Amino acid sequence: MAQLLQGSTLVLSDDSKVQAESHLSNKIVALYFSAGWCPPCRNFTPKLKRFYEVVKKAGKNFEVVFVSRDRAAEDLVEYYKDHHGEWTYLEFGDPHIQEFLEKYEIKTIPALKVIKPDGTVVVNDARTEVVDKGAENPLALFEEWEAFYES
């Protein structure tokens, strides 16, 4: 993950900040593009939160990075605090946000992409997978992602 988010700061659920390179090292990472003003996002976020909690409770090395499409920093923080899991987010205005929107061709939200450290997409439509497969058996889905990640 060092190459993709080099020099970036991530915010944790307790408001502390960490360097992306060290925090994401040796983890399977999903970029979550979402916004509080988006009804489909507010519908999907609790599903992702449940998936994340089950996977983390099982001791898996998994991290979600919230890439906000909110229009103001206050909106980002409010949406994150009220609805998201205990994952990380890029600070409002981080230059990587625009880079990721272009690189991953994000046209609509919510979008969830599982990526390798070099930025290669492992699972392009992870959102649909979380909704369709992750609701019944989150760990089985995550193990599929692990297999893709290692190949």
Regions found by a protein language model. Give the residues of each.
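A short beta-strand-turn-helix
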Residues: 6-29, 54
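Plant-skewed but cross-kingdom recognition/interaction modules and surfaces
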Residues: 14-23, 83-91, 104
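Eukaryotic intrinsically disordered and solvent-exposed regulatory patches
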Residues: 15-18, 50-53, 73-74, 97-102, ...
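Short pre-active-site segment immediately N-terminal to redox-active cysteine/selenocysteine motifs
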Residues: 27, 34-37, 108
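Conserved redox-active cysteine motifs that mediate thiol-disulfide chemistry
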Residues: 33-50
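Short coil/turn segments at secondary-structure boundaries
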Residues: 44-46, 78-81, 102-103, 126-128
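Thiol-based oxidoreductase modules, predominantly thioredoxin-like and allied folds used
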Residues: 59-75, 84-96
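Non-catalytic, surface beta->alpha helical segment in thiol-disulfide oxidoreductase systems
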Residues: 92, 102-149
